[in-house]
From Swiss-Prot:
EC top class named in words: lyase
Gene: dtcycB
Record key words, sorted: Lyase, Magnesium, Metal-binding
Keyword Ribonucleoprotein: no
Protein name: Diterpene cyclase DtcycB
GO MF annotation list: metal ion binding; terpene synthase activity
Subunit (UniProt): Homodimer.
Natural source organism: Streptomyces sp
Binding site for Mg(2+): 219, 223, 227
């Protein structure tokens, strides 16, 4: 399939970093995956180990030592859970599992004695994370990840829905893709974090939400080819745009999706610049963490390109956005972010 040039050309003026511990952590994750009986397939175990360590190495490259290993365990579990959304078609069955996992994330001791391997793996991962974080960081992180489980349950229910508007898609994507959950990594990893007042400031929240929505829309771009070839019933920004505008051709749908993503990234860069003018050390660390997640997502998905069926070298960065518009896009689900620019 010929891919429109805009699909895999990513505007991103943010530098990425890579953890020097990647290979060591990946080897440990491979052994842990087998110890937790998450798979008996060595090839699958190797892929999961690289994915789990890769999330840490590219998204949170400054997490080292025990924290890197604890987060990588969770990343493995998150990868598996995300895949199960498509495999289990009964919302009741998946919802029951997601609810159990959400509670294990909040309190690992609730893991049932007769649970499945995924239950035990999550309990081990979150017990490990709890030991490495301060109580404040732990509560923040575990609550955010539990929140993501609700999004996965929603996504599983959407198998029964034919189409979503762009507004509804972005509202659901915020939770399903883990925007709130992903930003929690930027809070957990640095030694210093923003105060409660700084973190809750509307401009900080708008910046974090916009940053993580960029990641979510980038993931739609990475998975486009694989889902087109398999005819997967996956809700994406492109499917939502086509649902609202059935007459649009494939390339125009992709261009509009990329333009929306670039407008959101442009807004994030504006909000970040305003916040950095008088930011505390903790807030600066948080914003740097958001930067690393955005840039790291590009490196990670290029590295994991085979999973998405992408041709080698097809992921590119671009110095210019497809859309420089500074006004809100007229989508109720996200327009309020723009109100914080200049506020």
């Amino acid at each position: 399939m010929d891919l429109p040039p805009a699909l895999l050309s990513f505007y991103c003026p943010i530098a990425s970093e890579v953890s020097p511990e990647h290979e060591a952590v990946a080897q440990e994750m491979y052994a842990w995956i087998h110890a937790m009986s998450l798979t008996s397939d060595n090839r699958q175990a190797k892929m999961l180990a690289q994915a789990g360590a890769g999330f840490n190495s590219y998204f949170t490259p400054r997490a080292r030592g025990e924290l890197a290993r604890a987060l990588s365990k969770y990343n493995v579990c998150a990868w598996i859970a995300n895949g199960m959304v498509q495999e289990i078609r009964d919302p009741g069955t998946f919802g029951a599992m997601a609810a159990r996992w959400a509670r294990i994330m909040e309190e690992p001791a609730t893991c049932p004695a007769d649970g499945i391997p995924m239950d035990f793996a999550l309990a081990d991962a979150f017990s490990h994370i709890r030991r490495t974080l301060s109580p404040v960081k732990w509560q923040h992180f575990s609550a955010a990840q539990s929140h993501w489980m609700h999004g996965l349950a929603w996504e599983n229910c959407l198998h029964q829905v034919k189409g979503l508007t762009v507004h509804d898609y972005l509202s659901f994507r915020y939770v399903m893709s883990g925007c709130f959950a992903a930003a929690a990594f930027a809070y957990a990893v640095p030694e210093r974090h923003p105060s409660a007042e700084e973190w809750a400031h509307p401009k900080v929240r708008a910046a974090a939400d916009a940053a993580m929505m960029v990641d979510a829309l980038d993931n739609d771009r990475y998975s486009y080819l694989k889902e087109s070839l398999t005819e997967a019933d996956k809700k994406t920004i492109f499917a939502a745009l086509r649902h609202e505008n059935p007459a649009l051709g494939r390339e125009e749908v992709i261009v509009r999706g990329v333009q929306l993503r670039d407008r959101i990234l442009t807004l994030y860069l504006t909000l970040r610049g305003e916040l950095l003018c008088d930011a505390s050390e903790g807030l600066r660390s948080y914003l740097t963490g958001l930067d690393l997640i955005i840039a790291g997502n590009l490196v990670f998905c290029a590295d994991m390109g085979l999973r998405y069926g992408l041709p080698e070298g097809s992921v590119r960065t671009d110095a210019e956005p497809l859309d420089r518009t500074v006004a809100p896009p007229g989508i109720g689900a996200i327009d309020h972010w723009w109100a914080q620019a200049g506020a």
